[in-house]
């Protein structure tokens, strides 16, 4: 009789909760397990389930890498004060771990990664190639010449290269992206669960809102320096908050990239104040969210308002991604 009742309940879209034994008989799981059904339902206790209508099919990751410049446009040193190549290695290593964990859960999901390299010396580039040799990564060189007639003359070669690599990453997203596109910089170290949580939370929240959204993986300190109102949303495993500013690490859909191509393009034609001026304009019309707490750590100077997320064990995440 119990089995028949469970089948009938599931037929009508319900799951059974046995709070006495702390299990779900219909899902055959304990209640502190992941109760969600991939691409079908996102289940968070005690809020029930969300039917997934925004299903993620593929993810294109585009990582901008510069293993030589310590901190662009600054003379300050990063946390731990190591050569820049050490940050690039740890960033990519953490990304590889996150991709593998995500693929274990979302085996149907196509994940491809393109690395845009900006003039790394051979010694550094060889280290990166060794790191990714068995992964679905492609390294391409930044085409400086292509953008000399497009980007306005800048005060420094570093600024020009930064704008050029950003424009090349946006163009690759436009030409090669199919579903979700994730723009990443090589001074972020990611938690292993980062991608899996971003995908599952994207599906849940976008399905609830019935629209595409933009996600930033980092909980920046500057988000707490102004008395700005925000909305708190429930993701798959943590809270997310609405934000109206990001840096250049964010994930969005191909449809949103096409819709706001002019904003992305104008960001790269000249240096603006703030740098992300035209990107931030997008968030006046679209929902952008970041996690509470952070899924990725921006390793800048310890005093930077654009860097270290609060309540993170910085040394642990650094040491575990050598």
Located regions from the model:
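Short beta-strand/loop segment that forms part of the nucleotide-sugar
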Residues: 107-120, 141-144
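Membrane-proximal basic amphipathic "stem/tether" segments
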Residues: 1-42, 322
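C-terminal catalytic/acceptor-binding lobe
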Residues: 243, 254-322
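Short, acidic, metal-binding catalytic loop of nucleotide-sugar glycosyltransferases
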Residues: 79-87, 91-109
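Active-site-proximal specificity loops/subdomain of glycosyltransferases
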Residues: 121-178
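A solvent-exposed, charged loop/short amphipathic helix patch at secondary-structure junctions
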Residues: 62-90
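Hydrophobic targeting segments
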Residues: 59-63, 95, 111-115
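Conserved catalytic core of nucleotide-sugar-dependent glycosyltransferases
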Residues: 173, 180-182, 189-264
């Amino acid at each position: 009789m119990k089995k028949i009742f469970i089948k009938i309940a599931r037929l009508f879209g319900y799951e059974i909760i046995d709070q006495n034994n702390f299990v779900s008989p219909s899902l055959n799981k304990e209640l502190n397990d992941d109760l969600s059904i991939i691409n079908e339902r996102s289940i968070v206790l005690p809020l029930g389930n969300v039917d997934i209508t925004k299903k993620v099919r593929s993810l294109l990751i585009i990582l901008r890498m510069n293993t030589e410049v310590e901190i662009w446009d600054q003379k300050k040193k990063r946390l731990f004060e190591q050569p820049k190549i050490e940050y690039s290695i740890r960033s990519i290593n953490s990304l590889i771990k996150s991709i593998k964990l995500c693929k274990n859960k979302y085996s149907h999901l196509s994940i491809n990664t393109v690395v845009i390299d900006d003039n790394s010396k051979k010694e550094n580039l060889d280290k990166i190639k060794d790191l990714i040799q068995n992964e679905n990564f492609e390294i391409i060189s930044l085409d400086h010449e292509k953008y000399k007639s497009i980007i306005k003359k800048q005060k420094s070669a570093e600024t020009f290269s930064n704008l050029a690599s950003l424009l090349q990453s946006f163009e690759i997203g436009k030409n090669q992206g199919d579903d979700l596109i994730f723009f990443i910089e090589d001074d972020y170290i990611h938690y292993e669960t980062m991608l899996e949580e971003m995908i599952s939370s994207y599906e849940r929240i976008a399905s609830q809102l019935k629209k595409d959204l933009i996600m930033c993986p980092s909980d920046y300190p500057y988000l707490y320096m102004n008395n700005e109102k925000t909305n708190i949303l429930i993701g798959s495993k943590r809270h997310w908050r609405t934000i109206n500013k990001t840096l250049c690490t964010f994930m969005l859909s191909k449809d949103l990239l096409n819709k706001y191509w002019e904003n992305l393009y104008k960001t790269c034609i000249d240096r603006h104040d703030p740098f992300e001026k035209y990107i931030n304009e997008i968030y006046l019309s679209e929902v952008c969210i970041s996690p509470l707490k952070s899924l990725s750590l921006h390793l800048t100077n310890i005093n930077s308002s654009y860097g270290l997320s609060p309540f993170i064990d910085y040394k642990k995440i650094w040491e575990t991604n050598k």
